[in-house]
UniProtKB/Swiss-Prot annotation:
It comes from the Bacteria. HAMAP family: G6P_isomerase. It is found in: Cytoplasm. GO terms for cellular component: cytosol. The gene is pgi. Transmembrane segments: none annotated. Catalyzes the reversible isomerization of glucose-6-phosphate to fructose-6-phosphate. This is Glucose-6-phosphate isomerase. It is an enzyme of class 5 (isomerase). Its EC number is 5.3.1.9. It catalyses: alpha-D-glucose 6-phosphate = beta-D-fructose 6-phosphate. It comes from Agrobacterium fabrum (strain C58 / ATCC 33970).
Length: 541
């Protein structure tokens, strides 16, 4: 594998491979050769710094890295999350073919289908009004209380599928900052509000602190007996949930082979199901399952997750680009970059290989972004003219949901395509000067101004085009990126499915709480922490 990486570096260092403007000028078939389609989903990677030799080497790298074999281990239920001795089977949650999936020789599909059916029954009852609040009023607002994977996925997907909302209003509370829950409660009528507490262990400090506040809100307004009518839980800690006051028919479980950042397909998706209905939630699962089958069956050169992962690895470990920008040209995908940030950085932000040795080269990049066109008026300046090359990934639907605003959608499309073209083509010094002089500027002044209007170009980007952001399309897009992260993780030779980096800060916060409360001395902590504790204590009311 290392020899192939060295070949890639040697090939990429040649001008022919990385001069995108010249590559397009020399080959009018470049788009057709370096784009691939799955149903209506098109992936154009022709604006990446690749040629035929590089793509062939990347295909070879995938085989040498064992991506296909590891893929089968994941789908078949092997415990590839070896640091926690767990299978990785978010794919089973959307296994619409219902073929058996074995974990420890037990088919998990009956349990998966059972939870999905229970979710559907509960969601239908809330949506129809047959399941009411304590005072007999219909539920109008659903508040999901969770954090991390129990929040980012439902928030992102619920916003993305806003045109399909025909259920109660959805709200999401995650931050332990009391402002988050306080601002949400101000919007609610306790008689018509349902709270979903999403915590596998029912011990997550942020979630349980907010849950306690929500419980007081209901109990103080409606009485202790009302709690059971206004709460549901997504958890496996049945005893703790019962102690909270939530009845068993309002508890929806999931399994240790479902990682938090991969859990939107599970009962964690309950608020989404209530918002869009069980039928549309089923289509959401259908889209993900379609991508699962494509990932598992398509040849590497026609396989969107494979190609996306290979190019991501190439950008990170061959071209040494430390970051990638996620740029959906869809306002309803405004939380998609944050969702992918967790998916990618929590999965592949590792420094140790599966052998316990330091990673050679680099692991996952910094992932960030904002929807277009907003980002154009914020950070695109740096992407176009900054000293760092930042690979960009654009997403655009051919059709919106507002036919009366078709012209605005056409403007959106034009902006998206223009940005990817500008990143690739750039503008030479001669072109910049010619543009200035054509507007009447004197040569001497144009010579002075033109360098500031030069765009180097050769800034790589990938563009995804699809028909419309339906539940099916969103499920397919999320699954595409999940599998991309998997491919890169295999090539980085890391475990993409644990997250030990989250733990140390949690442990230290537990020890610092009594210090912040003034119950213990800060002695024993470093001088900076001691100084910060003292400064905050001095300002506290």
């Amino acid at each position: 594998m290392q020899a192939t990486i060295e070949k890639l570096k040697a090939t990429a260092s040649s001008t022919a491979a990385t001069d995108l403007r010249a590559a397009f000028a020399a080959d009018d078939q470049r788009f057709s050769r370096f784009s691939v389609k799955f149903d209506d989903l098109l992936m154009d990677y022709s604006k990446c710094a690749v040629n035929e030799e590089i793509v062939t080497l990347l295909e070879q790298l995938a085989r040498e890295g064992g991506v296909e074999a590891k893929r089968e281990e994941m789908f078949s239920g092997k415990a590839i999350n070896f640091t926690e001795d767990r299978a990785v089977l978010h794919t089973a949650l959307r296994n619409r073919s219902n073929t058996p999936v074995l974990v420890d020789d037990k088919d998990v599909m009956p349990d998966v289908n059972g939870v999905l059916a229970a979710m559907g029954k509960f969601a239908d009852a809330i949506r129809s009004g047959s399941l009411k609040g304590a005072t007999g009023k219909k539920i109008t607002d659903v508040v999901n209380i969770g954090i991390g994977g129990s929040d980012l996925g439902p928030v992102m997907a619920t916003l993305a599928l806003a045109p399909f909302h025909d259920g109660p209003r959805a709200h999401f509370v995650s931050n332990i900052d009391g402002a988050h829950i306080a601002d949400t409660l101000k919007l609610l009528d306790p008689e018509t509000s349902l709270f979903i507490i999403a915590s596998k262990t029912f011990t997550t400090i942020e979630t349980m602190t907010n849950a306690a506040t929500a419980r007081r809100f209901i109990a103080e307004k409606l009485g202790e007996g009302a709690v059971k009518h206004h709460f549901a839980a997504v958890s496996t800690a049945l005893d703790k949930v019962a102690a909270f006051g939530i009845e068993s028919d309002r508890i929806f479980g999931f399994w240790d082979w479902v990682g938090g950042r991969y859990s939107i397909w599970s009962a964690i998706g309950l608020p989404l199901m209530i918002a869009i209905g069980p039928d549309n939630f089923g289509k959401f699962l259908d889209g993900a399952h379609a991508m699962d089958r494509h990932f598992r069956e398509a040849p590497i050169r026609e396989n969107l997750p494979m190609l996306l992962g290979l190019i991501g690895f190439y950008n990170r470990n061959v071209l040494d680009y430390p970051t990638r920008a996620i740029l959906p040209y869809d306002q309803r995908l405004s939380r998609f970059p944050a969702y992918l940030q967790q998916l990618d950085m929590e999965s592949n932000g590792k420094g140790v290989t599966i052998d316990g040795t330091p990673v050679e080269g680099q692991s996952g990049p910094v992932v960030w972004g904002e929807p277009g066109t907003n980002g154009q008026h914020a950070f695109y300046q740096l992407i176009h003219q900054g000293t760092s090359v930042i690979p960009a990934e654009f997403m655009i639907a051919a059709n919106g949901f507002e036919p009366e605003l078709r012209h605005q959608h056409q403007l959106l499309i034009a902006n998206c395509l223009a940005q990817s073209e500008a990143l690739m083509k750039g503008r030479t010094l001669a072109e910049a000067k010619a543009q200035l002089t054509s507007k009447g500027m004197e040569d001497s002044q144009a010579d002075f101004i033109a360098p500031h209007r030069v765009f180097t170009g050769n800034r790589p980007s990938i563009t995804f085009v699809y028909d419309k952001l339906t539940p099916f399309a969103l499920g397919r897009l999320i699954a595409l990126y999940e599998h991309r992260v998997f491919v890169e993780g295999v090539l980085f030779r890391i475990n993409s499915f644990d997250q030990w980096g989250v733990e140390l800060g949690k442990e230290l916060a537990t020890g610092l709480l009594p210090v912040v409360e003034g119950k213990e001395s800060a002695a024993g902590h470093d001088s900076s922490t001691q100084g910060l504790v003292k400064a905050l204590a001095g300002l506290a009311g």
